[in-house]
Amino acid sequence: MKVIASSLRKGNVVEKDGRLYVILSAENIHPGKGTPVTQLDMRRITDGVKVSERYRTTEQVERAFVEDREHTFLYSDGEGFHFMNPESYEQVAVPEDVIGDQAAYLQEGMAVMLSLHNGVPLAIELPQRVTLEVTETEPVTKGQTASSSYKPATLSNGVRTQVPPHITAGTRVVIMTADGSYVERAKD
């Protein structure tokens, strides 16, 4: 299916010269003088090579048919990350390069959306928010509440983030998976 380049987003799959590419980032650039362009950073699915392409924003690009299906994360090992389709109980092994830095947020039993093209996993979409425990953070300093300040904290998955001063070690917090930012204290 042909679409205009400016409508492409991260995670979309395009076909170019008979090969499939997953879009890592898409940026619409509008220079003061000249034609607006869409800058695409893509990864070739067959061998993982990263390429950058520029298209005029109105240029037609072939978008590949990709099936998005819900899967449940089971475990990870040397072969990759293993997911199960909850309807058919079919298991899929996803290579580490497809998951990338999102691997830190995967938890056993987590429901994710896997993008598949002819049964081959291309991309993964995690839930927007995930609940994690703070394992380490600095103690609060009295009188530091005059301005809204945040302090560094290490989460149970090893990711470092900024949390409000009232959060202590052992507290469960809600984190955005897109950027690792603090949302709120968990309500459980």
Curated annotation (Swiss-Prot):
Record localization: Cytoplasm
Pathway: Protein biosynthesis; polypeptide chain elongation
Example GO molecular function: translation elongation factor activity
Region (Disordered): 139-163
Keyword flag Cytoplasm: yes
Keyword set, alphabetical order: Cytoplasm, Elongation factor, Protein biosynthesis
SMART domains in the record: EFP, Elong-fact-P_C
Protein biosynthesis as UniProt keyword: yes
InterPro entries: Elong-fact-P_C, NA-bd_OB-fold, Rib_uL2_dom2, Transl_elong_fac_P/YeiP, Transl_elong_KOW-like, Transl_elong_P/YeiP_cen, Transl_elong_P/YeiP_CS, Transl_elongation_fac_P
Entry's Gene Ontology cellular component terms: cytoplasm
Bias type Polar residues, positions: 142-160
Known function: Involved in peptide bond synthesis. Stimulates efficient translation and peptide-bond synthesis on native or reconstituted 70S ribosomes in vitro. Probably functions indirectly by altering the affinity of the ribosome for aminoacyl-tRNA, thus increasing their reactivity as acceptors for peptidyl transferase.
HAMAP family membership: EF_P
PANTHER family named among the record's database cross-references: ELONGATION FACTOR P, TRANSLATION ELONGATION FACTOR KOW-LIKE DOMAIN-CONTAINING PROTEIN
Protein name, entry field: Elongation factor P
Biological source species: Methylobacterium nodulans (strain LMG 21967 / CNCM I-2342 / ORS 2060)
Gene: efp
